[in-house]
């Protein structure tokens, strides 16, 4: 909004400054951070009063988690609010790619909110039926894919100019990437600070990737897909980082609030659509490797148990497996953060390695 206003009124100095995406990305990050820190305490108090018992805690989980009873959930409302307000100030509202990201963030956030609300009101672990939730996610993802997808070639990193033409099937692939990313982050969100920091790291990584993909000179030099307007995605990533850092302030152990499905689905879906829009879906699987590992651990656990009656892991998702092995919650979280940083560096290396 400020971007278009400055262009329309021809503000000297500020108009020149605001046209730089790097400046707007930094401003968006700081704005989202400040907004999140300001509204955070009020949101938490409101959620605590309205929810009473807070998020249901699994009885069959690690016994240390029982101390978290009474902690409110739906903290994702704070994240989405800070992210949205900062974007309205600094993004180019004419950008089709940013609107695709906004559709997924708000759409997935709403689905997550309904799921959280059902769990809190019934004080049960099962919220909205999985089939209903997934159907909603696929509808939202399909609309976002229609907005975000231009070329239908799948870019394969590391190999020089290797693209796999998928044609119309690319849209199906894009939808599965978006839905898969949303649910993978959702499965990761099981410990204080575990999901939000890897999301921040992934968003920071894709801010760099999106900016480079949006610049024809850099994209040509690096041999990566050039996506016109992709630089605006860096501003969206910056908003995710700022809002995420603000949430982490309150989610640091012992957490004062959980993001719930409201936040995890919104942020995961956003990462998915950003990767699709920037044509770096495979790189997302690398950068978000922690989320992939968490999701795969659940799939393997369920599949093997149904077939043999035996468990591969002591408990799934895999972060609970390490807790059952005797790792403290803080140890699991910090070590998983380190894994995320390493994976982000590997993801960035694919931009240059050929």
Swiss-Prot record:
Keywords: Cell cycle, Cell division, Cell inner membrane, Cell membrane, Cell shape, Cell wall biogenesis/degradation, Magnesium, Membrane, Metal-binding, Peptidoglycan synthesis, Transferase, Transmembrane, Transmembrane helix
GO annotation terms (biological process): cell division; cell wall organization; peptidoglycan biosynthetic process; regulation of cell shape
Any one annotated GO CC term: plasma membrane
Cofactor: Mg(2+)
Spans through the membrane: 27-47, 73-93, 97-117, 138-158, 162-182, 193-213, 230-250, 256-276, 282-302, 331-351
EC primary class: transferase
Keyword Metal-binding tagged: yes
EC number(s) from the headed UniProt entry: 2.7.8.13
Recorded superkingdom: Bacteria
Pathway(s) it belongs to: Cell wall biogenesis; peptidoglycan biosynthesis
Swiss-Prot/TrEMBL catalytic activity: UDP-N-acetyl-alpha-D-muramoyl-L-alanyl-gamma-D-glutamyl-meso-2,6-diaminopimeloyl-D-alanyl-D-alanine + di-trans,octa-cis-undecaprenyl phosphate = di-trans,octa-cis-undecaprenyl diphospho-N-acetyl-alpha-D-muramoyl-L-alanyl-D-glutamyl-meso-2,6-diaminopimeloyl-D-alanyl-D-alanine + UMP
Membrane topology of this protein: Multi-pass membrane protein
Major subcellular location class: membrane
Compartments where found: Cell inner membrane
Molecular functions per Gene Ontology: metal ion binding; phospho-N-acetylmuramoyl-pentapeptide-transferase activity; UDP-N-acetylmuramoyl-L-alanyl-D-glutamyl-meso-2,6-diaminopimelyl-D-alanyl-D-alanine:undecaprenyl-phosphate transferase activity
CDD domains documented for this protein: GT_MraY
Biological role: Catalyzes the initial step of the lipid cycle reactions in the biosynthesis of the cell wall peptidoglycan: transfers peptidoglycan precursor phospho-MurNAc-pentapeptide from UDP-MurNAc-pentapeptide onto the lipid carrier undecaprenyl phosphate, yielding undecaprenyl-pyrophosphoryl-MurNAc-pentapeptide, known as lipid I.
Protein family according to the UniProt entry: Belongs to the glycosyltransferase 4 family. MraY subfamily.
Protein name (record): Phospho-N-acetylmuramoyl-pentapeptide-transferase
Organism: Novosphingobium aromaticivorans (strain ATCC 700278 / DSM 12444 / CCUG 56034 / CIP 105152 / NBRC 16084 / F199)
């Amino acid at each position: 909004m400020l971007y278009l206003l400055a262009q329309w009124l021809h503000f000297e100095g500020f108009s020149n400054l605001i046209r730089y995406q790097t400046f707007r990305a930094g401003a968006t990050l700081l704005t989202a951070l400040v907004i999140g820190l300001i509204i955070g305490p009020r949101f938490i108090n409101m959620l605590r009063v309205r929810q009473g018992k807070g998020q249901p805690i699994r009885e069959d989980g690690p016994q240390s988690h029982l101390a978290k009873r009474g902690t409110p959930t739906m903290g994702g409302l704070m994240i989405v609010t800070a992210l949205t307000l900062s974007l309205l100030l600094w993004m180019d509202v004419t950008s089709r790619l940013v609107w695709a990201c906004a559709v997924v963030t708000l759409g997935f956030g709403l689905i997550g909110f309904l799921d959280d609300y059902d769990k809190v009101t019934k004080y049960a672990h099962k919220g909205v039926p999985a089939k209903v939730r997934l159907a909603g996610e696929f509808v939202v993802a399909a609309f976002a894919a229609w907005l975000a997808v231009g070329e239908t070639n799948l870019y394969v990193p590391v190999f020089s100019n290797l693209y796999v033409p998928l044609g119309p099937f690319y849209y199906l692939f894009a939808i599965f990437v978006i839905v898969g990313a949303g649910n993978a982050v959702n499965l990761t969100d099981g410990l204080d600070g575990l999901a939000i920091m890897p999301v921040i790291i992934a968003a920071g990584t894709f801010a760099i990737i999106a900016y480079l993909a949006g610049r024809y000179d850099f994209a040509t030099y690096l041999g990566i897909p050039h996506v016109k307007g992709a630089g605006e995605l860096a501003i969206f990533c910056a908003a995710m980082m700022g809002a995420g850092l603000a949430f982490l302030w309150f989610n640091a152990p012992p957490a004062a609030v959980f993001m719930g499905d409201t936040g995890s689905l919104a942020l995961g879906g956003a990462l998915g659509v950003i990767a699709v829009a920037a044509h770096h879906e495979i790189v997302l699987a690398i950068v978000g490797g922690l989320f992939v590992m968490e999701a795969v651990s659940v799939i393997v656990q369920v599949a093997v148990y149904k077939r043999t009656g035996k468990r591969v892991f002591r408990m799934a998702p895999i972060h609970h497996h390490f807790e059952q092995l005797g790792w403290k919650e803080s140890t699991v979280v910090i070590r998983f953060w380190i894994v995320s940083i390493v994976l982000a560096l590997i993801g960035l290396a694919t931009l240059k390695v050929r």
